[in-house]
């Protein structure tokens, strides 16, 4: 079965076939239109939360411990960086020079001067070379590119 055919009915069997454990629980914290997905492996765990109110497009509202507000369009770039002046400008310049159009840029931080997270929704695909160049920028700790199918 292909990953693109993932749905609520077959999620458990697909996860188990790949050696993953899947558990479901309900919480009023996210409301009736919210969902949270937690992934763990080895010593790491990440949780992503979002909302999809009826009749409205979905939005990501949390990535890890960071509160964000961004639509999962074609491609999402997720960066972790130091919260210092110039990071957003350097990222925007690099993406613009690479021909990548920014649809939304959401920067979140836990504390001034500490770790920050950028959730950047862009038009079209982003190649591995752009990701590698983002990692070369000062104060960028990690760069992840997520391509959404059918977004």
Segments from the language model and where they lie:
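NAD(P)-dependent dehydrogenase/reductase Rossmann-like domain
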Residues: 1-151
């Amino acid at each position: 079965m292909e990953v693109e055919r993932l749905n609520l009915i077959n999620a458990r069997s697909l996860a188990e076939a790949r050696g993953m454990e899947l558990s479901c629980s309900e919480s009023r914290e996210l409301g009736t239109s919210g969902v949270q997905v937690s992934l763990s492996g080895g010593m790491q765990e990440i949780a992503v939360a979002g909302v999809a109110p009826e009749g409205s497009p979905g939005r990501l509202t949390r990535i890890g411990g960071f509160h964000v507000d961004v639509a999962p369009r074609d491609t999402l770039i997720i960066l972790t960086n130091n919260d210092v002046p110039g990071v957003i400008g350097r990222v925007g310049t690099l993406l613009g020079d690479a021909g990548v159009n920014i649809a939304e840029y959401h920067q979140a931080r836990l504390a001034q001067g500490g770790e920050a997270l950028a959730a950047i929704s862009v038009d079209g695909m982003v190649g591995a070379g752009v990701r590698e160049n983002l990692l070369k920028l000062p104060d960028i700790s990690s760069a992840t590119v997520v391509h959404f199918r059918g977004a």
